[in-house]
């Protein structure tokens, strides 16, 4: 029985090798050099009612799909192969013949999405495209971590009965998503800005999340803490069965996490908002969340409002500041090292748009650089205002780090401000959560700090003056 079944199947493959779009991957099987056999074709899995029947398709289309429905067939196939060494060479030849027609299918499938759905005005790390024949859209994410070089990832969003094209190298979800896991607090803020935060069922580090909905629903189990980085609770994730996990990368892809998510069959996508140098570019990533929730128009309207308020305030500050710009120092030492951001960073952009002048101009790279303490002290001494001073809540806490700080003019003049006005008991700052999506509010705060005469309010939202 096994012999007849597998022989017929093999003959079918061999006879149709010039018209089949299949790929055979072979590795170390006992006695014939094979332990793994993967078959791929454009035919949908449910078409395989007979394990020995293969669908003829154009040889060059080369769209790759793995079919679990023919696992039994493959097992049968191996049984006969193990006693038929003479087929080993033939299989190797077949593999080489077929491989020549398999290149580029994923690229071609992605290229089918030619309809412009959303092209960001400020962000550089993503775009959204569609295709004429259905409502599916493709989110393309580029270089979502430092040093990515030329990384490109795709998320295919299906809706209204659309089908995933065979061979597309993409994670696939159906919209609207119902259950999302957010690995960054800024992801939570994106859904909240759209009024869609109820779709979040999991977060990373729930004690550091400021969002009201998340905190109200954590104790009843509707929002779970899935853990951190490589210490993710995969057992919990598997039981939750989320539609999508939103990841972030710092220096590269976390292959341990992505590999396990693939194993569990949980779709994921990297969100690269933190890589954007423009404050509005960071906020514009909310359009990805809007696409996932089927609220594209609302997302566009929300972002347009944020951008309009930001740009209007920026223009007013530019007109009021004249030639006088307060010099601004950033950060405090970390383990005897003072990290100063690039003059291209989003924080420096905010300072400049708010009418300030960043004191450190040597770094024009895309990362922060370490500055020795003596140089940093001289920079702080030249500043009119000092902001983002780590965990400090009072001037006493700041000067306790280094008694010399008491002589810095910004300290003696009470011009030290920190971005931790809105903070969780565990120390999570809403500045790095909702502030990422509301740069208009951050700009208003900084305008109040640097140029109170140009501000439309004296009240601070994310910042507070250290006393």
Regions from the language model: what does each represent?
Residues 313-402:
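Flexible, glycine-rich surface segments
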Residues 63-66, 77-78, 102-188, 298-329, ...:
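Bacterial Sec-exported substrate-binding components of ABC uptake systems
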Residues 180, 186-189, 206-209, 232, ...:
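Solvent-exposed loop/turn segments at secondary-structure junctions
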Residues 17-29, 36, 57-59:
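N-terminal amphipathic/hydrophobic targeting modules at extreme N-termini
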Residues 222, 239, 243-246, 253-337, ...:
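Extracytoplasmic substrate-binding proteins
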Residues 137-140, 145-238, 244-250:
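A short, structured surface patch at a secondary-structure boundary
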Residues 2-18, 33-38, 49-50, 89, ...:
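Short, positively charged low-complexity motifs
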Residues 64, 71-74, 78-100:
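Sec-dependent bacterial lipoprotein signal peptides
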């Amino acid at each position: 029985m096994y012999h007849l079944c597998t022989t017929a199947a093999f003959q079918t493959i061999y006879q149709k090798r010039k018209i089949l779009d299949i790929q055979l991957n072979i590795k170390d099987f006992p006695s014939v050099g094979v332990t793994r056999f993967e078959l791929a074709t454009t035919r949908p899995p449910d078409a395989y009612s007979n394990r020995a029947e293969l669908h003829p398709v154009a040889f060059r289309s080369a769209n790759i799909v793995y079919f679990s429905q023919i696992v039994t067939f493959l097992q049968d196939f191996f049984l006969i192969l193990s006693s038929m060494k003479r087929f080993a060479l033939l299989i190797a030849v077949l593999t080489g013949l077929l491989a020549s027609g398999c290149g580029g299918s994923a690229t071609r499938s992605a290229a089918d999405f030619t309809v412009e759905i959303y092209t960001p005005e400020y962000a550089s790390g993503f775009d959204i495209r569609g295709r004429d024949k259905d409502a599916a859209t493709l989110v393309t994410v580029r270089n979502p971590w430092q040093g990515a070089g030329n990384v490109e990832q795709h998320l295919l969003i299906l809706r209204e009965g659309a089908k995933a094209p065979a061979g597309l190298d993409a994670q696939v979800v159906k919209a609207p998503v119902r259950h999302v896991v957010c690995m960054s607090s800024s992801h939570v803020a994106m859904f909240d800005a759209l009024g869609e935060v109820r779709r979040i069922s999991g977060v990373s580090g729930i004690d550091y999340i400021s969002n009201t909905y998340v905190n109200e629903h954590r104790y009843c189990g509707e929002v779970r803490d899935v853990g951190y980085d490589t210490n993710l609770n995969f057992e919990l994730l598997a039981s939750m069965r989320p539609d999508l996990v939103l990841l972030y990368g710092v220096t590269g892809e976390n292959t341990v996490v992505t590999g396990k998510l693939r194993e569990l069959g949980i779709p994921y996508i990297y969100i690269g908002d933190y890589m954007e140098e423009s404050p509005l570019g960071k906020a514009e990533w909310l359009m990805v969340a809007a696409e996932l929730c089927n609220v594209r128009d609302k997302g566009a309207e929300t972002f347009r409002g944020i951008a309009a308020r930001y740009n209007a305030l920026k223009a007013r500050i530019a007109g009021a500041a004249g030639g006088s710009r307060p010099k601004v120092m950033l950060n405090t030492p970390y383990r005897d090292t003072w990290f100063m951001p690039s003059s291209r960073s989003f924080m420096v952009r905010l300072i400049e748009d708010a009418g300030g002048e960043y004191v450190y101009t040597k770094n024009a790279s895309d990362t922060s650089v370490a500055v020795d303490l003596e140089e940093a002290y001289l920079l702080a001494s030249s500043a009119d205002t000092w902001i983002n001073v780590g965990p400090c809540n009072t001037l006493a806490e700041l000067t306790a780090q280094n008694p010399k700080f008491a002589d810095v003019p910004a300290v003696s003049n009470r011009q030290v401000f920190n971005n931790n006005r809105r903070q969780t008991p565990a120390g999570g700052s809403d500045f790095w959560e909702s502030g990422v999506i509301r740069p208009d509010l951050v700009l208003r705060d900084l305008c109040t700090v640097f140029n109170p005469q140009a501000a439309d309010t004296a009240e601070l939202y994310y910042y507070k003056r250290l006393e």
